[in-house]
Amino acid sequence: MSEQMRNIAIIAHVDHGKTTLIDSLMKQSGMFRDNQQVSERLMDSGDLEKERGITILAKPTSIEWQGVRINIIDTPGHADFGGEVERVLQMADGVILLTDAAEGPMPQTKFVLGKALAQGLCPIVIINKVDKSDARSEEVVDEVFDLFVALDANEQQLDFPILYASGRDGWCVVNLDDERTTLSPLLDTVLRHVPAPDVEVDAPFAMLATLLDSDQFLGRCLTGRVMQGTARVNEAVRAINLEGKQVEVGRLTKLLRFDGTSRVPVNEVKAGDIVCIAGLTKASVSDTIAAPSVTTPIFSTPIDPPTMSVTITVNDSPFAGTEGSKVTSTMIRERLLAEAEVNVAITFQESAAKDSFEIGGRGELQLGVLVETMRREGFELTVSRPKVLYKTVDGQRQEPIEEVIIDVDSDYSSAVIDALNKRKAEMSDMRTAGSGKTRIVFLAPSRGLIGFQGKFLTDTRGTGVMNRLFHSYAPFKGAITGRRNGALISTDTGVAVAYALFNLQDRGALFVSHQEKVYQGMIVGEHNRENDLEINVLKGKKLTNVRASGTDDAVTLVTPRKLSLEDMMAYINPDELLEVTPDSLRLRKKYLDPNERKRMARAESA
C-alpha cells in the first residue's frame, strides 16, 4: 500500500465550480511563487473550455500536502462528455462531490455520482458557493443524501463527510460558523477519508490507459494509473486490448509525472501513481500497457454508446475554398479519424454518399464542440441536422429518451409544458421550488429536444434553466413536427443591399446584414409563413436623373438574428445544411438550384 499518495477525482454538475476550486487548492498548496501571475481556471486549457466555462477533457494535476502527494483529476460535468468521466473514475480511490448551495443536485451530478458509487468510491461532499445570497445549504445537504439513497449507495458511502466552501474565495469549513480562512480542512479530510492506493509494487508492471493525447515532441501520450509493479525508461512493454489480444510491443521512451499543471520527466514510476507514458504508436484508451510477462488485461468500464449523429461533408458552396485552408475530403477524413481515435465517445463511419462522413456522439454540445474546434483549425465543411441513433430490440424500433429537469418562473410553466407535450415528452414530476419557481421533470425523446433550447429561452424570457441527461431507450414515440416557419432563400449570388433588405423585412426575420456576401440557395432569413420563399437581396434602388424631395431617406434596418453554431445545427431541416468556415457560418439548402430542389422534392414525395 502506498501511504504517501492519494488519488481523487472531483465530480459535479456543469458550472458548479470544480475547476475554480482546483485553482484555489493549487495556489494554497504552494504550487506558485507569491509574485507569479496565474490565469483563471488553470485546468481549462483549451480556448473553447475557457470561452464556454465548461471542462471538456478530463485532466490530472498533482499537489503536495503534509508530505503526501495528492493526484487530483478534474472531470467534465456535462453528460455529453460523460465518456471521459467513466474512465477517469477508474484512476481514483475517492471522489469529491461538489454541489452548488443554491441549485442543489442537478442531472449531471446524478449522472457522475451514479458512476462513482457503482465503482465503490466513497465521496466527500462539498456544498460550494455558500456565500451566494440565495444559498440554502441545509436543504441541499438533505437533497444530496436523498440522491445517494436513490442511487443505492451502501452504508459506508452514506456516511459521507460534509464541508462548506467558496472555491472562488478559497476557503472551506466543517461548520458554517467556523472561521473562513483556507482550504486546509478539505485537504485534511482527503488525507483522512480517502484510502491510499492498495497496490502490489513487486508484481510485474501493468497500467490502464485512460486518456490519450498527442504531443508534437513526444508523439502519442497515454495517461493512466499504474495498477501494479514499477517501470523504468526504455523498458519493453506490450499493449493488450480488453479482449486480451496484443495490440503492439514497444519501449517506454518517456515517463512523465504530473506536478501542478505541468508534466515532469522521471526515470521510474510506481504502482498507485497517475502517470503519462510515451513510446507506443497504436495503443489506445482502455488498453492495458504491461510488462511482456502479463497476459490478462485490466477490466475497463464499457463506454455508453453514442445517441446522436451528424453527417459532415466537403463544402461545395460557391464560396468554397475562399476562407479556409483545409478544404479537401482527405484532410477532413484524417482529422475526424484522429478525433475518433483520441475521443472514445465519438464514432466515425464512412457515409454512403461521396466525400461524406457520419460522426456519432453523446449530444448536440459534444458534436458542436468538435465542429467548432475544426473550424478554428482552418477547416471548411458542411454539417447536416443532428439525427438520433435508433436501435432495434425484438423487432421493435427504439429511440433514446432523456430526463429533462426544468427550473422556471411559475408564470411560464404552462408554456413550457405545452411546448414539450408537442415534442412527445411525458411529465413525471412537478413541484414548487420556492420564491415563485417551479421544477418540472420530463422524459422526452432526444430528437424532440433538438433545437428546443432556443424556443425554451424565448418562452421563459431567458429566465428558465434546463438540464438534460440520457435516461434509457424506449419504443419509438411517433412523428414530431419540425420547424413551423419556412426559409427565405436567396435567388442570386452577390452582396446583400440595404435597400433590398429594408423592403423584405416584413416578410420575416433576416439572418444577413448590409454588404454581406450571399449565394443562390443560401438561407438569408426565416419566413413569416410555413412555406419557403425565394427572395432577391441584391436588388438596388433604380437610379434616375430626376430627384424628388423626401425619396432619398436613409433606410433603417432591423438587427439581423444571429445564431450560435449549435443553434444553427438544430435549426436546419433535413433538406438543409450548415456551411462552416473559419470566418462564417451560413445556412443553405442541400440543393442550391431551385429547379433541382423542386425535382428532388417531387422524387421524395413520389
Question: Which residues does each predicted region cover?
Answer:
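Structural and coupling elements of P-loop NTPases
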Residues: 1-606
